[in-house]
Regions:
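Conserved short submotifs of the Hanks-type protein kinase catalytic core
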Residues: 110-124, 128
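Conserved activation segment of eukaryotic-like protein kinases, specifically the C-terminal portion
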Residues: 195-210
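Catalytic-loop of the protein kinase fold
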Residues: 153-171
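AlphaC helix of the eukaryotic protein kinase fold
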Residues: 75-94
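Conserved end of the kinase activation segment
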Residues: 211-221
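Activation-segment/catalytic-loop signature of the eukaryotic protein kinase fold
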Residues: 106
Length: 348
């Protein structure tokens, strides 16, 4: 069974490709995340042994620095599980969006699956917990994360993240927010049990009420609830319903918590995301649109041509009155304009 710490200390290349430098300790109970150097990009390979003792800047001068997420040996896969892992991550691998931090490579070493991801030196949004205060910064966060979720949910079939939380939102070098760990749905076939099963996917404090029901298929609305819980924690320093998340909300009929110090629009948005009924929650696309317009809900706006038709009717009506209403062409024009279909503006 692979002991990743001892393996790193041995100085060997992971999968004959990556020099493990140090643990990033950014994951939960299913995997270890390591900073690594892609040995194939290092010109002077004699310096590989020195790499673990160098600063990030010095290592980046040697070659490509990446983050490797190595799933723990208890999640080792049999042959069927390996194929499912490859099939599922081929879908995720092909996702391309600014606000998604997708893997650049994935494989299996010593029966243990691993992912290769871009290294984000700025870390995750966990460091913003209780510190995200300015409305402009909050709207930026909402737009970036909601845009990434909207992309995933629009895939065929939809990709449900199932573990949206501050630690899974990373900050890139130009301070955009990017979702990581997406695409983790139910994958059975583990050699020592199940790998990524529904029971273990997700973090309780961010799990929507419906996630605790038996035989519930993953739905996009559960990601929206988790996003609402994430926003609440970033703004207040606490998760909205305690460590039991949506379970506590459903069992205790807890009142919706206030979000102090933010605009009414942002508070309404968070409350809508945390609605007990999944059907009452906004879509990710609606959240992204709200962030761009900095309001929630989006106010209805009648199309411009409606106003133009009204103006035309008034002008023609005035002209008809001026001419005494006896001109046939005026009557026909008025009649034709009145038959122009006027669409009713709806909320997106």
């Amino acid at each position: 069974m692979l002991d990743i710490v001892k393996f790193a200390e041995s100085g060997q290349l992971f999968d004959n490709h990556y020099k493990l430098l140090r643990s990033l300790n950014t994951d939960g109970g299913t995997a270890d995340v390591w900073l690594a150097l892609d040995a194939n990009t290092v010109k002077d390979r004699s310096r590989l042994d020195d790499a673990p003792h160098l600063s990030d800047d010095e290592v980046q001068e040697l070659g490509l620095v990446v983050a490797i997420k190595i799933y723990r040996p208890k999640n080792a896969l049999d042959i069927e599980g390996e194929q499912r892992f490859r099939d599922e991550y081929m879908i995720v691998f092909n996702c391309n969006h600014t606000n998604l931090l997708h893997p650049t490579n994935y494989s299996i070493f010593d029966e243990v699956p691993y992912l290769v991801l871009p290294y984000c030196r700025q870390g995750s949004s966990e460091k913003l917990i209780g510190k995200l205060k300015k409305d402009a910064d909050i709207w930026k966060y909402i737009e970036d994360v909601a845009s990434g979720l909207a992309y995933l949910h629009a895939c065929t079939p939809p990709i449900i993240h199932q573990d949206i939380k501050p630690g899974n939102i990373l900050i890139d070098d130009i301070f955009n927010y990017a979702i990581t760990d997406f695409g983790i749905s139910s994958k059975k076939g583990g050699k020592h049990g199940y790998y990524f099963d529904d029971e273990n996917s997700g973090t309780l404090a961010y799990m929507a009420p419906e996630r605790f029901l038996e035989s519930t298929e993953p739905i996009p609305q559960s990601d929206i609830w988790a996003f609402g819980a994430t926003l609440y924690e970033l703004l207040t320093g606490n998760v909205p319903f305690g460590e039991d998340g949506g379970y506590a909300q459903a069992q205790q009929s807890v009142a919706m918590p206030d979000v102090p110090g933010v605009s009414a629009d942002i508070q309404r948005l968070i409350h809508a995301c945390l609605a007990l009924n999944p059907e009452d929650r906004p879509t990710a696309e609606q959240l992204a649109l709200s962030a761009r317009q900095k309001q929630f809900p989006i106010k209805s706006r009648k199309p411009l041509y409606i106003s133009l038709v009204v103006i035309a009717l008034l002008l023609v009506g005035g002209l008809s009155f001026f001419l005494g209403g006896n001109n046939c062409w005026v009557s026909r024009l008025t009649s034709n304009i009145c038959r122009v279909p006027i669409a009713t503006a709806t909320r997106p």
